[in-house]
Amino acid sequence: MTTSASEILSHFQEYLNAEHDLREEIRIVVRDLEQTVREIQTSLQPIHQPAQTANYLSFCENALSMFHKIQEHYKQLSSKIPLNQYYRFNDHWRFVTQRVVYMCALIIYLKEERLVSREEVADMIGVQVNREDGFHIDLDDYLMGILNLTNELSRLAMNAVTAGDYSRPLRISQFIGELDAGFREL
């Protein structure tokens, strides 16, 4: 029995169509996640206004109140990714996840002036820490998000001086110095 090339290749076409559909579903969820991230970033921008230094905690609480949406988006993503296929598709959400980590780190820094742990970030966004446990926060994404925090803190230090808060830049400098030392050990 002979099968034609078109019959053989039609099975591949079905596979390619299914993968295209899955990637499109993932893109839709990631697009919604990106929109939520923009909303949260916008809610945190007033920290740079000189008159708002006393309101850091309220901005953080407002931003945290929107994290349930982030958790829902990651839950949707997790449900769409086939078992053991995380790294096949993670290029879709890698950069937005780095921004989410940065926002988590900024919020924790503003509230407590300390570095957020990978476990805390995973808990805040509703994912796992370890790959073996399922949809997780990749170590590289965590580290890149933390690096992005330094840019925002540099901006915050300059704005703090403008607002007359001369101790904040010193604390930020010490924190970034400790962060730098930690990254040098990696």
Annotate each predicted stretch with a short phrase.
Residues 11, 15, 106, 179:
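Residues that form generic nucleotide/phosphate-binding pockets
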Residues 1-78:
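Leu/Val/Ala/Ile-rich N-terminal alpha-helices, chiefly Sec-type signal peptides and the beginnings
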Residues 14, 18-32, 51-62, 85-95, ...:
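Non-transmembrane, amphipathic alpha-helical segments
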Residues 56-132:
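Long, charged all-alpha helical bundle/coiled-coil segments in cytosolic proteins
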Residues 3-10, 101, 107-148, 159, ...:
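Intrinsic, low-complexity N-terminal interaction/targeting segments
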Residues 162-186:
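Long amphipathic all-alpha helical oligomerization modules
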Residues 30, 34-37, 143, 147-154, ...:
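Hydrophobic faces of stable alpha-helices that mediate helix-helix packing
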Residues 37, 41-44, 67, 71-74, ...:
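A structural signal for well-ordered alpha-helices, especially hydrophobic packing surfaces
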